[in-house]
Amino acid sequence: MMRAVYGGIADQMIRLAEKKQLKDRELWKLVTKQFAETPDDADHGWRGEYWGKLMRGACMTWQYTRDQELYGILTESVKELLTCQEADGRISTYSRQEEFQGWDIWCRKYVLLGLIHFHEICAEAELSKQVLEAAERHLDAIIERIGEGEGKKRITLASDAGKGINSSSILEPVVRLYMISPRRQYLEFADYIVENGGAEGFDIFQAAFEDRLYPYEYPVVKAYELMSCFEGLLFYAQVKKEEHWRQAVIRFADRLLESESVIVGGSGCRHELFNHSSLMQTGTEYDGRMLETCVTVTWMKLLSR
């Protein structure tokens, strides 16, 4: 594996984040603790996203620093998370009575991403096997309840936020897990997500391919979640070898470069939404929130692929 070694501010900031956040054992305990309880029942929130986000970033950081203390902390956290997995593979911050609403699948997406990223760096054969099996069982529990057929819920109806694009964004780790563990049901589930169009009542993937609209003209303009769906579509296009969907991602990104890039590097100048930011960045109206950091990071990740 090739590694880049930076100097100056890039290296300093990576090591600062590692020292101050990623080596904070109390923080890891806090984000893992959420899965031993059901805190998101109260408001259908997204407390379950933090473990996976933190794990993904920490694994990427470890690939740069190769810090053994950090690796040990990540190993401890993964083992703790696995104790929260239920008999059927489910890992969630929602109870069974409240599951598959709000941000439940979104949170489970990040659990899956966190497990996949740790699996990539895991040096212990037995733990690596356990982590992969946990990821498989976690996804299997979702596929059992989401999709077509009696007793299943359509993925775009598994959330009342943003026409379900937050749920559809699980496409990325579904495909990534298929690339590690090529089970037919994982690719079929990815097919299902794409065929459903990402959003309830609107096919974001086909709209991007047809290239008639800017993303701020879509009926759903939540920037972070939209881009996350297209990250997944790019992995899907790679696995399926479908130029149609690769072009859809390229056209989507080109439209964003034209209409949403701002001088400070983010996008989405109205709340956390696409709003023709390239133009509106000079506006004088401010609703108290703009240029969500998650949007900036996801934009960087999408372009890096």
Indicate where each model-derived feature is located.
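Glycan-recognition and catalytic cores of secretory/periplasmic carbohydrate-active enzymes
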Residues: 1-305
